[in-house]
Amino acid sequence: MTSPRQLAAIMFTDIVGYTHMMQSDEKKAVALLKHYNATLEKWVTQHGGRVANYYGDGSLCIFNSATSAVQCAVDIQKELRQEPVVPLRIGLHIGEVIFEEDKAIGDGVNIASRIQSLGRENTVLISSDIHDKIKNNSSFSTTSLGHFDFKNINKPIEVFALSNDGLLVPERKKLSGKVKSKNNVRRYVYILLSTIVIGI
């Protein structure tokens, strides 16, 4: 039996530094997690999405509309940067999602996860595919952070940061996430150039 597939706007969220929070003040960390879960579910439902998976202190949410997904992310961050502050990072991408045993998987999910991994607290980072869908919407402001080579992703992806009032636009040099090491990139370029030279 073929697993159900759906083209969707995918939103990944993650609480920054949650493991450290648990180690330093478990009671506070648990309270923040409950606040985060309630806020997430409220806004995802309001914007017509659904929470597909929870991952401890993170989540994967699915939307039929890129605009709805991005507005949901903005609303979540707006609420969670108020007291009690939850340091959240969010990444979004559009792609095909495969549903297996109540879990959402697929390349689109992996890319959204990689984009989220770049973020810092109070950031909303989006792929160029999401950006193409919202770039003419005056409700959103964006700043390009450049192209990134993510682990286990075939090609570089341009990532944009939402720059609406109150959101953090991180400096590229301060970003770290699930990206290929510079040595691997150099090795790939060397192999590619060697192949071209041999072909000549």
Model-derived features: positions:
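Bimodal feature
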Residues: T2, H35, Q82, I90, ...
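Long, domain-scale regions corresponding to catalytic signaling modules most often appended to membrane systems
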Residues: L162-I200
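Hydrophobic alpha-helical segments, especially transmembrane helices
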Residues: Y54, I90, R187-Y188
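Catalytic NTP-binding/metal-coordinating core of nucleotidyl cyclase/transferase enzymes
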Residues: M1-C72, E79
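Catalytic beta-strand-to-alpha-helix segment of the class III nucleotidyl cyclase homology domain
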Residues: A38, T45, L60-P156, F160-S163
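Short, acidic Gly/Pro/Ser/Thr-rich loop/turn segments
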Residues: Y18, F99, L167-V169
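Generic secretory/membrane-interface signal
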Residues: A8, T19, V51, E101, ...
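Generic alpha-helix initiation/capping and coil-helix boundary signal
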Residues: M22, I62, A66, I105, ...
